[in-house]
Amino acid sequence: MGVYGCMNFAYANGLVRSHISGFISGGDMTPIAVDLWNVMYGLLEKLYPGKIDGVDDSIITLRCLYCLLRLLHQRSYYPVFVADRGFYGNGKTLYGAKAIAATCIATRGGSGRLHARLFDECGSTDVGEARCKRKHPGKKVCRWSERFETPKILYQLCMSIIRYMGYPYVDAGTMEADDICANLFHTKTVAYVLSSDTDLILMGCDIIIDLTRIFPPTIYCRDVLAALQMDYFTFLLNFVRCHTDLHREPTLKSMQEIINLSSAKRCLHDTDCATDDDVPRCIRPLYEEQDRRTGENSYHSEGFDLHIRKDQSKTSCWDNDVSNYTDTNLIRGVQKALKSLRPPRTRCEILEYKFIKHVIATIIPERRTSRVSILKRFPIMQEGRDETAVEDLIFCNIFDVDEASTIVSQFIKRIPEVRPLNHILLKYWGNDALKTTRSND
């Protein structure tokens, strides 16, 4: 899931850093958004890597959830839980990458003006040559969470326990968890997103990969941009082809394939590339070569070029705080660059065009006046702790009285009471938490 090859790229280039939590550094709790299903199945794979016999799914679900809550408390993280398809898990996703892909496939690209020949054009262009060299296995590799013997996480049981324990959560039945997490991140509600899904990097978020380590590994979007030497919009434009929810083989490309292919094209068309060592290798739009043959404009207009940060060192980029990074590098130039997008011509371009528009609408503030821009945050629900409801719910789902009593004791006695969300936001963000508007001048 996510951006194909992004995790390998991050580890290969030293972009995965250890995050010192607030508890270890002596600070207050750090608000983070938790992509619940991604994290729960990650814990499930660590706790139960093999086949399990004779253990009910409700017991496994509650054990994993208790482990998650304990880890969050020990690392001094304050979670805002986000799950797909709303609180009850029965909503229909209308927005996001999966919904865009499903809609475009159902409507043959989303537009009747496209000729059938163009639907297969993206698979036959030279941008797919690098993938043709890869050896494809004869049998499709099944993910661990999709195996028959893998235990199932009970959706409603998880969310009900989270609600009765007093944790904040988001109930958005028509949205994917990734989009909600990105919204919480860019509205300065949370500082990080707990998820191993790298498409959050494509949406400009900083992600914590693994909570089980004492110093959780973290990938910062600004570090990825600095390593690639590009601004956010150029990053989104080039690597949307790596999104696994939008593309499949052979259209799907890895990050390294995009980098290698674009660097090779640059060397072919720039005569100074092989001789001038001071010029950094940069990435060109995916459709640049195709547009040169057809004589049409690229996704970039002639006046919009790749932003090379020659004067910005890696250290200075790491030292930038979240608000400065978000306001400066993510918002500036996106509205201008959005106007340079040309109408798509192929099915792949339609998918990518709609996803780019969706991402920008999700994370970029809407300009209301010349000085004020507003980005609305999804409503966050939080109720008081109800230990009686927690106990009743556990005993209703677990028939073994001894096991149920043990789990009830763990949740009630070892999980401390959750403080109000507004109190955490005020202590972490300061006066910024009181602002409902953000200026991007």
From Swiss-Prot:
Its EC number is 3.1.27.-. It comes from the Viruses. One of its GO terms (molecular function) is endonuclease activity. It is found in: Virion. Its main location: virion. One of its GO terms (cellular component) is virion component. GO terms for biological process: symbiont-mediated degradation of host mRNA; symbiont-mediated suppression of host gene expression. Pfam families: XPG_I. InterPro entries: PIN-like_dom_sf (IPR029060), XPG-I_dom (IPR006086). Keywords: Decay of host mRNAs by virus, Endonuclease, Eukaryotic host gene expression shutoff by virus, Host gene expression shutoff by virus, Host mRNA suppression by virus, Host-virus interaction, Hydrolase, Nuclease, RNA-binding, Virion. The keyword RNA-binding applies. Minor structural protein that acts as an endoribonuclease during lytic infection. Degrades host mRNAs in the cytoplasm by cutting them at preferred sites, including some in regions of translation initiation. Belongs to the herpesviridae VHS protein family. This is Virion host shutoff protein. It comes from Gallid herpesvirus 2 (strain Chicken/Md5/ATCC VR-987) (GaHV-2). The gene is MDV054.
